[in-house]
C-alpha cells in the first residue's frame, strides 16, 4: 500500500510547490502519458497539422480541480488541459506538457464541469494547462467554452478565465496560435491571463500571475474599447482592476 501511495505521488514530485498544494487525494487523478502511436493527424482549415489525435478525440485533460481558489477570482472549477510545447523553465505543471497525459475530454466530462458551476457559491470556470491555446486544444475546447457561455452569459455572475503562455498578439490573425476557432474562444472569455512564465521575473506577491511580464486582461473592457476605437484587441488591452486591498500585499 505504501509503495502504491508513493507511485501515485511520483508525478507531483516533478512539480513546483504550487502543484504540491493540491490535496493528496487528487494524486490519483493524474494518469501516466500514453503514446501517440497509431493516432492519425488532424489538419485544420488553414493547413496546420496537429499531432496524432484520433478524429473523435481532440484533447486530453490532466486534472479538474473543483472548489479552486488559486486560479481566478472567488471559488471556481478549474480545467487543466494536457499538452504544451512552450516548456517554460520551472513551470508549475510540467506533468501536463504531454498531449497524451491524463484522460479523454469527452461529453461526459463537459457535462460534469458545467453541472459543477450550477451553485451560487461557484464564481466560474478557469481553463489552464498545459496550454489551452495550442491549436489542437483550441479545437477541443471551443464548443465546450461556448456551451458554458450559453449556459452562463456575461453578467450572470459566472466568469470564464483562461491562462495562456501566449501573449494576446500571438492569438490575433497572423499570430502563431491563431486558428479558425481562436476568435470564438476569445469572444467567450471574461479574463485572459497571458504571457509565458519567466523565472527571472518571478514575483510571489502577484495575484493570479507567476511573473511580472504576464498580464490579467479584462476581455470585456478590451472588446468594448476595440469596438469603440476600431482597432484590434491587442491594441485595446484593458488590464483587470483588482480589489485595491490586494495592492498592500508585499513580501
Model segments located where?
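Extreme N-terminal basic, low-complexity initiation segments
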Residues: 1-13
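Basic polycationic patches enriched in arginine
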Residues: 14, 18, 31-34, 39-42
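N-terminal [4Fe-4S]-dependent radical SAM core
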Residues: 49-80, 89, 93-100, 228-230, ...
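P-loop/Walker A phosphate-binding loop and immediately adjacent motor/lid segment at beta-alpha junctions
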Residues: 146-149, 202-250
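Structural recognition of alpha->loop->beta junctions
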Residues: 175-201
Amino acid at each position: 500500500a505504501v509503495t502504491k501511495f508513493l507511485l501515485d505521488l511520483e508525478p507531483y514530485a516533478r512539480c513546483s510547490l504550487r502543484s504540491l498544494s493540491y490535496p493528496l487525494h487528487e494524486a490519483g487523478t493524474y494518469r501516466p502519458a500514453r503514446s501517440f502511436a497509431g493516432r492519425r493527424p488532424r489538419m485544420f482549415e488553414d493547413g496546420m497539422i496537429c499531432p496524432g489525435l484520433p478524429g473523435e478525440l481532440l484533447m486530453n485533460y490532466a486534472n479538474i480541480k473543483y472548489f479552486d481558489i488559486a486560479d481566478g477570482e472567488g471559488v471556481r472549477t478549474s480545467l487543466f488541459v494536457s499538452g504544451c510545447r512552450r516548456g517554460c523553465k520551472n513551470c508549475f505543471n510540467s506533468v501536463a506538457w504531454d498531449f497524451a497525459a491524463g484522460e479523454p475530454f469527452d461529453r461526459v466530462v463537459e457535462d460534469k464541469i458545467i453541472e459543477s458551476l450550477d451553485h451560487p457559491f461557484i464564481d466560474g470556470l478557469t481553463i489552464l494547462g498545459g496550454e489551452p491555446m495550442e491549436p489542437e486544444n483550441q479545437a477541443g475546447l471551443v464548443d465546450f467554452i461556448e456551451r458554458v457561455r450559453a449556459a452562463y452569459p456575461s453578467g450572470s455572475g459566472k466568469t470564464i478565465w483562461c491562462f495562456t503562455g501566449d501573449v494576446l498578439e500571438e492569438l490575433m490573425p497572423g499570430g502563431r496560435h491563431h486558428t479558425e476557432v481562436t476568435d470564438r474562444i476569445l469572444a467567450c472569455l471574461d479574463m485572459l491571463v497571458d504571457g509565458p512564465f519567466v523565472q527571472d521575473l518571478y514575483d510571489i506577491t502577484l495575484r493570479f500571475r507567476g511573473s511580472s511580464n504576464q498580464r490579467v486582461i479584462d476581455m470585456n473592457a478590451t472588446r468594448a474599447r476595440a469596438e469603440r476605437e476600431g482597432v484590434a484587441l491587442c491594441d485595446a488591452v484593458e488590464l483587470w482592476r483588482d480589489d485595491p486591498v490586494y495592492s498592500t500585499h508585499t513580501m
